[in-house]
């Protein structure tokens, strides 16, 4: 029988990073192991080693497989960095005492998947790396200088106001220096949607962050929506309302609601979304040979062609803007130009049909230039 280690793995090691991610979410879906840094065989060996040391265990039930921490792993992490882990590994919280119902586990899996997307996009996820924006009694919050993600459990620290929101589907909030993004993760299927619950979530963000805790940084208009999903096909289903009224996400809850995939494409675009300067550089590059934006136009646009066709930059996959653009073209029997990344082209071309010419940005070339 292997003996228990006396201390946690080094904080820079893959083993530590894996244990830390499991700690924050409660259960990491086995399918997400491929998204962590390192080769496949190396990561498999890391998992085997942690199991041998009795720090990690596999849990399989109802067709769901995930990784959970053992009591020994929790003890080591708490001893190593209590500021980082005590919130998740103490008491009867959902990440410490995990329920076995499929729906509860799926929510933990969606949170875990979101944390990986954020971490891979260089967004701060650990409590000792970001301001205590939602901590009760916090008086000196300061400003958000670098992107930081707070899970829905962290948000509920504020008090009973957030706890009382029933039916809200958000997994957390991403704070950048300029914006507040309420984050939703659909995973591999459309999710049920409650307009009233999500409007309450948005209103509370505006009250707690924009008016009470951080009015020096955020205006109420800074609150946006960010939607994560496993494939661009989900974006098509949302744009075409295939889920019916119970899945009607694009109901006006958020004027800006970007869709990103839970993969390398989405992680890179998330980095762009969090960096206003880089985003402006890309916009300027794409609009070089076009006429200026026309605010008086009846079709939403970012620029105009010399012959008067509206142009929409859709690389951020802002679904409400794309739908408004397409609807206006259809109603006015006009054509326009939509610019997006190559991995988004097929879905957006299928959605717009012959109403829009969809032009592709080479994603690989973009990444080499903007994130060398």
What residue spans do the PLM features occupy?
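A general structural signal for short secondary-structure junctions and capping/turn motifs
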Residues: 48, 173, 214-218
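Basic, Lys/Arg-rich alpha-helical nucleic-acid-recognition elements, primarily the DNA-binding modules
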Residues: 1-90
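General detector of folded, globular domains
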Residues: 72-82, 88-91, 101-119, 171-173, ...
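Exposed, interaction-prone assembly regions rather than primary DNA-binding/catalytic cores
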Residues: 95-195
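Short, ordered beta-strand-loop transition motifs
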Residues: 58-63, 175-177, 304-306
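Long, compositionally biased intrinsically disordered regions
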Residues: 183-192, 197-372
């Amino acid at each position: 029988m292997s003996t228990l280690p006396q201390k946690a793995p080094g904080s820079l090691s893959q083993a530590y990073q894996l244990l830390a991610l499991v700690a924050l979410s409660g259960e990491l879906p086995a399918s997400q192991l491929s998204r962590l840094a390192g080769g496949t065989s190396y990561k498999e060996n890391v998992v085997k080693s942690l199991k041998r040391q009795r720090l990690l265990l596999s849990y399989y039930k109802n067709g769901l497989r995930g990784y959970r921490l053992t009591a020994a792993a929790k003890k080591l992490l708490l001893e190593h960095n209590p500021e980082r882990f005590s919130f998740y590994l103490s008491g009867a919280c959902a990440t410490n005492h995990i329920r076995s119902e499929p729906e509860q586990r799926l929510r933990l899996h969606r949170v875990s998947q979101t944390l990986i997307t954020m971490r891979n996009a260089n967004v701060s996820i650990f409590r000792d790396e970001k301001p205590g924006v939602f901590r009760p009694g916090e008086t000196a919050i300061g400003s958000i200088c670098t992107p930081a993600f707070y899970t829905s459990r962290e948000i509920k620290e504020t008090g009973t106001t957030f706890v009382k929101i029933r039916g809200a589907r958000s997994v957390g909030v991403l704070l950048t220096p300029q914006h507040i993004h309420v984050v939703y993760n659909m995973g591999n299927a459309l999710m049920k949607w409650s307009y009233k619950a999500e409007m309450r979530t948005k209103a509370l963000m505006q009250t707690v962050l924009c008016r009470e805790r951080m009015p020096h940084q955020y205006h109420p208009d800074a609150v946006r929506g960010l939607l994560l999903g496993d494939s661009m096909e989900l974006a098509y289903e949302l744009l075409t309302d295939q889920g019916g009224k119970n899945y009607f996400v694009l109901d006006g809850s958020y004027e800006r609601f970007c869709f990103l995939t839970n993969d390398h494409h989405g992680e890179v675009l998330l980095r762009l979304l969090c960096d206003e300067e880089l985003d402006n550089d890309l916009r300027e590059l794409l609009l070089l040979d076009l006429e200026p934006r026309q605010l008086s136009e009846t079709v939403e646009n970012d620029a105009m062609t010399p012959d008067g066709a509206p142009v929409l930059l859709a690389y951020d996959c802002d679904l409400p803007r794309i739908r408004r653009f397409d609807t206006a073209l259809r109603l006015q029997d006009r054509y326009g130009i939509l610019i997006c990344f190559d991995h988004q082209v097929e879905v957006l071309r299928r959605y717009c049909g012959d109403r829009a010419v969809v032009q592709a940005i080479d994603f690989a070339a973009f990444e080499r230039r903007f994130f060398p």
